[in-house]
Amino acid sequence: MEFDGEAQAVEPTSRMLSWARNSALYRLQQRMMTEKQLRDAIMRKAREKFEDIGPAQVKALGEFAVTFAYGIKALDDTAYAEITVRSGQRSGKSKRGLAQKLQIKGVARETATAALQETNDLVAAVIFARKRAFGPYRRVEPDEKRKAKEFSAFARNGFSFEIGAKVMAMTTEEAEDILSDAPL
């Protein structure tokens, strides 16, 4: 492909590679990322930073950054999935919601499934109810409108109707027993 008589370069320059390495280091120091997130971020920023960069160079920079990150052991999708799942469970996120989040972040289905095996939707639902003052943690007597609102909130957050009904029917003591027995 030619633009204005010049052939588009296929290989990234040493300046581009150095920038990709430094940018990957900076991003991974700021937060834990998946392989897909790092590749996409480097490719997006490379298009912004370098004016005459071609699609092949952009892709090569993304791959270089990912390879570099794996080389220094700063990128690990399995650890990312496990940490995300544990954090989500502690904050009351459903297994379904966590699976969707991992899929969006680009974690492989097998890795996400392995990380999600230890999760317990009942524990997460009780935590969610405690955060929102639903079910056993309700401060006022519910009317039908309030119950419908609470069931809707459970459903929107990925919990099944059965789990929502189970949590809504619990006493505070039963809910606290579930939380005390749960490994968080």
Swiss-Prot record:
Tagged with keyword Protein transport: no
Pfam families: RecX_HTH2
Disulfide bonds: none
GO biological process: regulation of DNA repair
Example of a GO cellular component annotation carried by this entry: cytoplasm
Superkingdom of source: Bacteria
Record's subcellular location: Cytoplasm
Keyword annotations of the record: Cytoplasm
InterPro entries tied to this protein: RecX_HTH_2nd (IPR053924), Regulatory_RecX (IPR003783), WH-like_DNA-bd_sf (IPR036388)
Chief location: cytoplasm
The protein's role, per its UniProt record: Modulates RecA activity.
Classification via HAMAP family: RecX
Family: Belongs to the RecX family.
Name this polypeptide is given: Regulatory protein RecX
